[in-house]
Amino acid sequence: MVTALYRRYRPETFAEMIGQSQVTEPLMTALRTDRVNHAYLFSGPRGCGKTTSARILARCLNCAEGPTDTPCGVCPSCVELSRGGSGSLDVVEIDAASHNGVDDARDLRERAVFAPARDRYKIFILDEAHMVTSQGFNALLKLVEEPPDHVKFIFATTEPDKVLGTIRSRTHHYPFRLVPPAPMLEYVQKLCDEEGVQVEPGVLSLVVRAGGGSPRDTLSLLDQLIAGSESSTVGYERAVALLGYTHGALLDEVVDAIGAGDASGAFAAADRVVQTGQDPRRFVEDLLERLRDLIVVAATSPEAAAAVLRGIPSDELARMGAQAAAFGSAELSRVADLVSQTLTEMTGATSPRLHLELMLARVLVPSADDSERGALARVERLERRIGVTDAAGPAAEPETGRAPAPAVAAAESRAQAAESRPQA
């Protein structure tokens, strides 16, 4: 039986935590200066390190060399609270989701009176603290306000607003946050290197995106991909199928067809989405993500685009550069708006395929869009056909909800006249 990745690589010190410097640095400072409070409230999304940080804080407080911001890792307390340790008698973890009543609070209050069995402090970690009832919190109120010198409380919750206000006011509140993509990508790459696992280009970007900034969710998905791989290499095809994302080749096909005005190719790709059992909503969401990337590529230099779009292979970035050039800024903006509007319309829709195909029809026919944005897209398309370039740079974004400006209409008329003139 193999232990899950998120358990094997659970941090044991604050220095090993990623993306939570707003929490770890103040806590380490408090430990170094001996200004530790009697009660803490850790809040934030699931899987971002709240319970892990509570255990690390308990190790720091009860370390034989402590209180210290860096536990020694060899004393009995550190060993018992380490990754895979048996647990300490003086560190009590309570699942508040199932121990949330008055009787449980009274039992905790009675246990807090007794001195620690061996260590410096008796520490109570209440996970899912928002599940404690008002009566349970009220039973704990006096103890949390004025605990014995040997007692520390750490509350962990995903919903701090549901924790009784009088309890919150007696704690030091540290909000955790989701980990940004860049450090998460670096972390999972390092983990794969330590595990001796090879991943094909683009796989880790999908894993980080699917994890949504939660280290635990990200490692669970990576663990699933590694377990389902026949060799020590995680393939892109299997990752796309398992995570439910649209294959990059299919997105390239649709984008190329839209850029070239190829209705047959675009509708054939949409049909393949349905025939292969993919979710049309997921396809539209992935298409919007790709259009966002193309807008970044079109608006910035290759170096800046590579810095923003981390994890995308260089050959794919080059291909996206060619796709962005085939559209133009105004056309990309218009298409992205239509795709975003369709994604909103598909929420709760009974026929998502119909919305997908209608979206493609609107995207492929700019003349159906009578807004100023649509007029600019038509002008840009005509200028590209006759080889006219914009020497003054990209125009300012027009205000929506107004009739096309006279300058836009005049420019469109000139472009149409130039297109109709016979070529020399």
Q: Which sequence ranges carry the predicted segments?
A:
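Serine/threonine-rich low-complexity intrinsically disordered regions
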Residues: R32, A64-P67, S301, R385, ...
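Short, solvent-exposed coil/turn linker segments
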Residues: T13, D95, G235, D279, ...
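P-loop/Walker A NTP-binding region and its immediately flanking N-terminal helices
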Residues: M1-H173
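Residue-level marker of regulatory loop/turn positions in helix-turn-helix DNA-binding domains and
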Residues: P67, L243, H247, P406-A409, ...
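Long, low-complexity intrinsically disordered regions
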Residues: D390-A424
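Extended, largely alpha-helical regulatory/partner-binding modules appended to the mid-to-C-terminal parts
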Residues: P76-L89, N100, D104-E110, A117-R120, ...
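General helical structural elements
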Residues: P11, K50, R59, V113, ...
